[in-house]
UniProtKB/Swiss-Prot annotation:
EC number: 1.14.18.1
UniProt gene name: PPO2
Site positions per UniProt: Cleavage: 378-379
Family designation: Belongs to the tyrosinase family.
Name of the protein in its database record: Polyphenol oxidase 2
Biological classification of the source: Eukaryota, Fungi, Dikarya, Basidiomycota, Agaricomycotina
Cofactor(s) the protein needs: Cu(2+)
Amino acid sequence: MSLIATVGPTGGVKNRLNIVDFVKNEKFFTLYVRSLELLQAKEQHDYSSFFQLAGIHGLPFTEWAKERPSMNLYKAGYCTHGQVLFPTWHRTYLSVLEQILQGAAIEVAKKFTSNQTDWVQAAQDLRQPYWDWGFELMPPDEVIKNEEVNITNYDGKKISVKNPILRYHFHPIDPSFKPYGDFATWRTTVRNPDRNRREDIPGLIKKMRLEEGQIREKTYNMLKFNDAWERFSNHGISDDQHANSLESVHDDIHVMVGYGKIEGHMDHPFFAAFDPIFWLHHTNVDRLLSLWKAINPDVWVTSGRNRDGTMGIAPNAQINSETPLEPFYQSGDKVWTSASLADTARLGYSYPDFDKLVGGTKELIRDAIDDLIDERYGSKPSSGARNTAFDLLADFKGITKEHKEDLKMYDWTIHVAFKKFELKESFSLLFYFASDGGDYDQENCFVGSINAFRGTAPETCANCQDNENLIQEGFIHLNHYLARDLESFEPQDVHKFLKEKGLSYKLYSRGDKPLTSLSVKIEGRPLHLPPGEHRPKYDHTQARVVFDDVAVHVIN
């Protein structure tokens, strides 16, 4: 039985807002800042403190809000990664944060001496905002830069306060952090640290500008080309996989924000939730789950295996839509399960994407969200002269709406696979259009990245040893870039281009060991888009094309 039931915020179904709009809303932003201040200032043993809420995800590996402690717990966080419960466990996780945040906001609102009724109403309407990195990777300055933010004080006057969205201050550093190097000495969360262990925000902004196009491309393909739960939900190997999973794209954001020259908090699963940006990030992950569910209305959680042990699920346990999502209880001894989580209204929230669709049929909602995905994430190909390939790609992404014939196109990807735990830390693989040793670091050479979000763990990490052969895969989609130089996506044209242009990759990690398990393939899969259809389909009557003779060089 839990001491805190997970029921979501009160006051009916309200929208979680894009952080870009949220920071412009005086009342919401003021209440959010003040509420974070309140939760972050609480004693770290308080179950409703920011520290305890963040600690559910990873360290300090203690039970959260349990009336009676369990025996023989598996020493890990509660979070589920690399398995089919990844999206739904995090849905309940966000909900408990949101309800406690709203409670703090109501407490804050009652301190206002003027227009108190309006402030209390705003607090009741407050929901956790999201960072739509698939559309606009650079968040507002209030999230990434500003040491102080402007809010409205209790007397109605404007004031400047320290920004609680930028970092969390540990008070104190928890003893459980001791085996984890720099994390045992950093007094605050740190993003993109340099070799001197200092936060490097200019470097992070540079990375965001570089990766924005490929993150949008991955988001689009993830939503459009994964129609089975096992392929959509997590970054493990799945049969007939053609696009990155929701978790894989999620991993990219964690590593981008957290990993600089060394690991920062967002880059390590045990520490990530202590960074306030984690909650903006994961709220968008949940929003993408809602979009995907809308265009796949009859698909939900399937069965699988929990490779990694968690505090709530034993290692290698069979899991499915009825698996208890510890430590989140609806009431008494009734634990939330994925089967109850398809409808976000049960938890008191929605997203603006669905504003005009309430009460609509599932077919109407599916088509409307399909169009929204095309418009928001189906970005036009990179700048260049308009050509046949450009027009064809625009048709497939719904940028042009009218097509009367069955359109056909090859979908070209760099298909990457590796042992996730081989290097004992998080790492990144960055790919470039460049020959071996070529001029690879210019923006127009960058193609994309694949990231392993796993963090450094002590040598005694049983979970790491149990999963040392666990394979992770990822995809970098090339058509977006090929369209600026080629007239077609036919194999002979793409093959000639890649042979002449060259492909290289660079491994970014703290050590100097090579990634010996790495497999890189250039693949083309035939697509077709039937007349009047919104969603491209893979043409299984034709074989995929694999270029075995296109060398992918290593940049040292």
